[in-house]
Amino acid sequence: MTRPRRLAADHFRALAAAGLRTPIGTDLVLHERSDPEAVRLDGRRLAGAVQEAAERYRTPLAIPLMDLRLEKADLVHCVRPGVAEPDTFHFDVPPSDADLGRARAGEGASFLPAHRAHLDAIAEVAARTGLTPLGMAIGPFSLATKLLADPIAAVALAGRGVLAEDEPLVALAERSLALAELAVHRSLRAQLEAGAAAVIVCEPAASALFVSPRQIAQGSPVFERFVLEPLLRAKAELDEGGADLVLHDCGELTTAMVEALASRVRPAVLSLGSSRRLWEDVLLVPPDVVLFGNLPTKHFYSDETLPLDSVRSMTRDLVTRMRETAHPFILSSECDVLHVPEAGETIRRKVEAMLTEAA
């Protein structure tokens, strides 16, 4: 049964019209704590960091940590409980029917501590007034690539039309994607249950690095099969739960990829990396899809690479260009703004400039 929408249909467009600027910056606040790794495992304290980030950045959006390890850790724990280091685990043979069965049977199992804290933090924020509680999850394709030792070769073979029954690498990719979808949907349902009104689904692997633009141009359905169809199923999960999709892809994208993500998946918000010229991408994006991004915050740590004055000028330029397009737009970071030891104040100054520079 489909639940009522948790947000007004124009919620993000209204924020864009009001000129909202916000980084994905909770990691900076987390690392101001004396024990950030302990905070990651404590839902109440993690919610405090999320709320403090929203207050500092003057945004109504409660944006969680972009920790894309959570779903993989839970999945590996479910199907390979003896694995000590899930971050580095890869399947060396295609996941079996038994693996898929274990993943389905684990639907109601407890989440690992970091994932549990993430869910508890969403619930804590959702219980407070004045903030829009967002969730965060890795996308199905990006999770699948993390389950393979050589995802590029596997996806390339699939893109050439090689069948799973003829090539173990293709079977490995297809089976891993099926497992990834189960893990992502389980996470999405849990985040909706916790109170998320929208979920940021991160698909950085949906890019020219992992999916061949040449194969797509030649008519291969590889992007459709491995990226778009799983994303559409994830969006349907969110739609059924009454929540919006914020689709984040900071990978290197072609024009065709941007157009497909925007028009086929049609998220409420499309967040892109700094390689894209958003004022040109408006021609590819439906008018009701808010563009989000895309200052090069991965370089904020270095004054040599990206001086403060350059951040100010980039901010002015992007805001001005996007205003001229009249397309709904929220100025933000190209990805999550990560804490870098010894560069914290440098990064914070640039984030503040991004938020305050007049245009």
State where each predicted segment sits:
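Alpha-helix-loop-beta-strand connector modules within alpha/beta enzyme cores
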Residues: 114-130, 215-243, 350-359
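Conserved, mostly hydrophobic/aromatic
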Residues: 54, 125, 184, 191, ...
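Catalytic-face loop-and-helix region of soluble metabolic enzyme cores
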Residues: 3-14, 31-32, 232, 236-359
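Glycine-rich, proline-tolerant flexible connector loops at the mouths of alpha/beta enzymes
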Residues: 63-84, 91-111, 199-221, 333-335, ...
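N-terminal small/glycine-rich loop or linker at the start of catalytic domains
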Residues: 7-39, 74-81, 132-174, 205-214, ...
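N-terminal basic, low-complexity leaders that serve as flexible interaction/assembly modules and, when applicable
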Residues: 1-91, 224, 232-233, 319-327, ...
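Catalytic domains of carbohydrate-active enzymes, especially glycoside hydrolases
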Residues: 47-68, 189-198, 260-269
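Active-site-proximal, glycine-rich beta->alpha crossover segments in alpha/beta enzymes
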Residues: 80-190, 218-222
